[in-house]
Amino acid sequence: MIYHKYSHSEHIIDRFLEGYGWENGHHRPEMDVVSLYVEQVGENDLSRERAERHPGMKIYPTIAEALTEGGSDLSVDAVLLIGEHGSYPHNEKGQHLYPRYEYFQQVVDVYRRSGRAAPLFNDKHLSWNWDYAKEMVDTSRAMNFGLMAGSSLPVTWRQPSIDLPLGAPVKEAVAVWGGGIDGGDIHVIEAMQSIVERRRGGETGIVAVEAFRGDRFWKAMAAGSWDAGGWDPVLLESCLSRSNQLKSPRPTYSHVLPTTDDLKRMAGDSYAYRFEYADGLKATIVQFQAAAGQTDGGVVGDCSMAARLHDGDL
């Protein structure tokens, strides 16, 4: 875990320590953060200041000691695993090799040694490696402890504050964000998933995934429909029009819908994923990512999503 300004640790742990605004008051969770393990401590570290101000929370040099509070057996009621930020390598695919799996194994070692387990929440996706992620799920089931994971976007504010009617017959969905291979993808995927899983019949699973980048992405953009190899352009336009952070392709007071030529100039390294669900739902994630080194690029700064029902309604 890394703990600095605007880090995931600050966003999550500070809310446990300080509380947060909820409805018409300030909510303080009815639980205590009693121990902390921080792997990399830089000049901008906040963990030491937080521990000094909240003496009930102690920092330990290892994950095992944090879980046992310096003793021999598990002594906490729940575990929060945050493997984000810090100095870790990338692989050839651009994935950030965060050690979430390795952290998880150290947690499980304490569970096994103690003869009991506790629920664990893993911030964002389980791992960059599919086999690691599957092993984490299999281990939690074999040891019978709750394992939860995911992005914060499904539970953040929505503008407007709407949702799909429960049981809605959804035909196709598109979600848009500003890129970020691996780390950024999970956010927009989960934001869309939290909405479409309310569809008629509930979640059925995904049977196929297709990724587009480079020339294949722009060909898919021009295809005009899912059946032609792309996605619904009306849904894409709806996403861009709903964005509160749509970057105008030219100086103007109001939003301007970018053309394909604008998008190529502003977001030359864009990519997309198409998901085919077992019940026939088609969904696409479009990531308008600026080219490497492009400081004035980008299209949107927020995440937006649109869906078409079987009767044609958006």
Per-region residue spans from a language model:
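A contiguous active-site-proximal alpha/beta segment in oxidoreductase catalytic domains
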Residues: 105, 115-196
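C-terminal helical cap and adjacent loop that interface with cofactors, partners, or active-site loops
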Residues: 291-314
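Histidine-centered active-site/metal-ligand motif
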Residues: 8-10, 187, 314
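Short, solvent-exposed loop/turn motifs
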Residues: 281-282, 313
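Short, hydrophobic/proline-enriched secondary-structure or compact coil segments at domain edges
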Residues: 173-176, 273-277, 298, 304-305
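Short helix/loop capping segments that flank catalytic or ligand/cofactor-binding pockets
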Residues: 184, 284-285
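N-terminal glycine-/serine-/threonine-rich beta1-alpha1-beta2 phosphate-ribose binding loop
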Residues: 1-119, 135, 141-142, 199-208, ...
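A short, structural micro-pattern
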Residues: 30, 167, 269, 299-301
